Amino acid sequence: MNIYQDVEHMLMEAFNKVLCPKEIGKIDQNLINVEPPRDKEHGDVATNVAMVFANKLSIKSRDLAIKICNELDRNDYVSAVKVAGPGFIIIKLVDEVWFESLEFILKSGKDYGSSALGTGKKINIEYVSANPTGPLHAAHARGAVVGDALARLLMKTGYEVCKEYYINDAGSQVDILGKSTFLRYQEILGDDSIVIPDGHYPGAYLKDIAAEIVEKDGNKWLSRSVEERSDAFRKYSVQMMMEKVKADLNSLGIEMDIFSSERSLIQSGGVDSVLSILEERELLYEGVLDPPKGKQSENWISRPQRLFKSTLFGDDVDRAIQKTDGSWTYFASDIAYHYDKYKRGFYEMIDIWGADHGGYVKRMQSAVNAVTFDEATLDVKICQIVHMLKDGKPVRMSKRSGDFVTIEDVVTAVGKDVIRFIMPVSYTHLTLPTKRIV
């Protein structure tokens, strides 16, 4: 039972009496909106149906709306109906409609809202995917809740859903994380001269990781080579941070199905494989990028790079996939990652990103189209920023400065249910006062 679908049927019945069926057939009914009015005091349902039909049939929308209202007024389920503005129709339903709906919901129990819409279809939803360089902070909670809510809705409609977290463990930031942990390790072992350099991670959470290493291994790493200890501290730091991430997600009632590693993808030849596909399709070339629009930087140097012809697939400019030093860009490994999803049988993909990644959407969608020969689709949902206020002033959350409010802090203060309730509306900015949380 769906009240808004029932109203649509009522509207079509009214139109059959006002207009002939041939005229109705000319209209794209997807343009018709049947939804709650902005002001609930006006009624239960608002629709633009008269305006859509009038525009296509060269009829005055308000005149058509009045005719429809006259027909709807005879319906037993309609308590009142009126025309607003240029031709909007506002409908108030009789109480019995809502009583029947509530009765249907109670009888349906957990099955209410279920459908077979996605039966036989697989879909991959990737969300959160924060760098493993610190605990999840309050801003990550929004993408986490939006992604989880969407996954649950899709499962409710019959889709086979894979909830995935991409671990960005291949970049320089995880090397810096390992170095930062080693500095804390030296500090715990009695080196009073330790100073955390700029650009490293000063957060106290690394002291806990370093303390665990001391408890497990003692001071053995002080005598090991830089290469050996760097690799060990990087691996252990990422491992411990991901355990913390999983615990934070669980505290929100979120369990991922898969955690995929960027480093493992690169080491297994994933990037080389996907770029060979682009090479075969003649979609790579050596070129020079123009300076970023709207930015004047004295440090900008025009240099030849390996570029992907993303403009052929709707992007604004072609994109670099390999740097002049031969290393891959983040974009290259992201292409490989999405191609890996495709190889695992996911032809429909959804990514939940923060607002700061909005400019990355076109290039990623163009890459997915290119490497899957348009067989797969990528839909990106953007979550707007979560602002934290301290003493009425915005706080810029940064792991490298150590200044952020963690998900653990927020869950402890208000509980997971409150967070899950306020976070899902992803398209508006959200402001949280830290005084009430920490």
Q: What is each PLM-predicted segment?
A:
Residues T434-V438:
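N-terminal low-complexity segments that are often proline-rich with Ser/Thr-Pro
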